[in-house]
């Protein structure tokens, strides 16, 4: 089921299937990728309790539990419940108490709330992760919104760019195409020009663009030379992934709290970069904002 939230500047739709966006519209223009099974059927999946992938889809935890999780975790494939809806805010909930089968692969009782709040021409997305168990709970959380690119007919993908808040000079780490895991010793030249990342389908011929060393906490998708577009602000997320398919008319700009297993990491979940740990009954919150310019 879909729920709509709107004000005078922006309208969004959120589905109980995956708990996330199916539409972000302003001034009669759709900004969110609408999904195409022949290219990428996703739109804005929520990554939980991992971001990216684990080596052999499995890991151990300090508590001795075996975790078995497919890429990006299970939250994006579950049916969520509407928790609340008001004039400018709605919240979706996924809880292990409603689906005990989730505990077989991730043995940590949890409640995950995705809260969507309209603020003028922006929507603030907050992920609230609560440890409902009696042990420390390791986890990762991240967003994966895909935006239409180009936005208008007659435009080319290469007409667009991502403008970062700051210059990002660090070389980029590389994902191994066959596994999606990260080789930290094999770094590639940063394709940015100053503060901008020119977009082209060739940029994604082999893998996503992974900013594991990142100064910016804000990035804007827009046509070259124009100010209008979509701005993503992601304070609290240490990593940013930029991804598309070579044949896809979209670009995913993904604030992540963690990364796929790296070549210098073992298979203990808490040893992975960016791992968050919630104490029993603790709620950890991470947020990002999508603003239409």
Predicted regions and their residues:
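Asparagine-centered strand-capping/turn motif at beta-strand->loop junctions
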Residues: 14, 127-133, 244, 292
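Beta-strand-rich N-terminal accessory domains
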Residues: 1-47, 51-62, 66-70, 215-236, ...
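Hydrophobic residues embedded in beta-strands of well-ordered beta-sheets
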Residues: 3, 21-22, 89-90, 123-125, ...
